Structures are given as C-alpha cells and as structure tokens.
From Swiss-Prot:
Top EC class, one word: lyase
One GO process term, biological-process aspect: quinate catabolic process
Keywords carried by this UniProt record: Lyase, Quinate metabolism
Annotated active site: 23, 100
Higher taxonomy: Eukaryota, Fungi, Dikarya, Ascomycota, Pezizomycotina
Sample GO molecular function, one term: 3-dehydroquinate dehydratase activity
Protein name: Catabolic 3-dehydroquinase 2
Gene: qutE2
Keyword Lyase: yes
Residues the record lists as binding substrate: 74, 80, 87, 101-102, 111
This protein's record includes keyword Iron: no
Catalytic activity as recorded in UniProt: 3-dehydroquinate = 3-dehydroshikimate + H2O
C-alpha cells in the first residue's frame, strides 16, 4: 500500500488552543485523525509524527527512506532556521510537500524565508488546516500515482 509520512514540528501540539484566530480550533489529534481517514479513502496509509525537537524530526525523516512514498511536513518555526531538516529531506530522496496553516508571507518578516520551499514538490500555505487535505490529495494524485505508472 502506498504511504505518506505526515510530520508536524514545534508547537503544533498546541493546535486548537494556541492563537486560534490564526491557527483555528482543530487540535493536532483531530487533524491527524482526519488526515488518516482521507488518506485511507484514497488507498494510502498515512503515518503521523510530531516533535518539538529538530533532531527527532531528522531521525524520523531518515527512517522514512525506502519506506515512504511522500512526506508532508509542517516544520513550524524550523522552516526559517533549519538547514539540517532541509539536508535530511534532500538526503532521503522522498518527495515532500511543505504545509503551513497560516500565510507565512503575510506575517512577520522573519517568517518569509523557508529553507525547504525550493526543494519541495509543492508548498501549501495559508489554507488553514485544509492545507493538509490539499497536500494529501496532491500526494495521492501527483506523486504516488506517478510512481505507479513507472
């Protein structure tokens, strides 16, 4: 069965309570359950992973090599700081989609730069938690189905 790894970075465990005017009221467990259900409906297994620690995220990316068809990642604040996560994603050669709940380009200047975007198969920014659904749709349609053709 094709598979997607969903990674959520720092502070995303606070979804539903942290700045709900920006991030909404959906909690991380609700988001993960919804993502798994949508993926299953498309015949795709989705595994979710969250960490507030850069090294643990890197370790999980490394573990995905050879076992995962696509990665969906919301790196949180590591978007703007982590060359190490960038290098891990490049190193495992698994296509990835970068997701952000808010429009990072409409926020503080320091949030405008991403160390991941230029290497991502796609970037989904500012669609709220629907961005995760869009990422699953894209991964299933464009990344996984393309692999099955070849």
């Amino acid at each position: 069965m094709p598979s997607i790894l969903l990674i959520n970075g720092p502070n995303l465990n606070l979804l539903g309570t942290r700045e709900p005017h920006l991030y909404g009221r959906t909690t991380l467990p609700q988001l993960e359950d919804n993502a798994k259900a949508l993926a299953a409906a498309k015949g795709v297994k989705l595994e979710s992973f969250h960490s507030n620690h850069e090294g643990r995220i890197i370790d999980r990316i490394h573990e995905a090599r050879g076992h995962t068809d696509a990665i969906i990642i919301n790196p949180g604040a590591f978007t703007h700081t982590s060359v190490a996560i960038r290098d891990a994603l490049i190193g495992v050669s698994v296509p990835f989609i970068e997701v952000h709940i808010t429009n990072v380009h409409a926020r503080e200047e320091f949030r405008h730069h991403s160390y991941l975007s230029d290497k991502a198969a796609a970037c989904i920014i500012g669609l709220g938690t629907y961005g995760y659904e869009a990422a699953i749709e894209y991964a299933a349609r464009e990344i996984i189905s393309a692999k099955e053709v070849y």
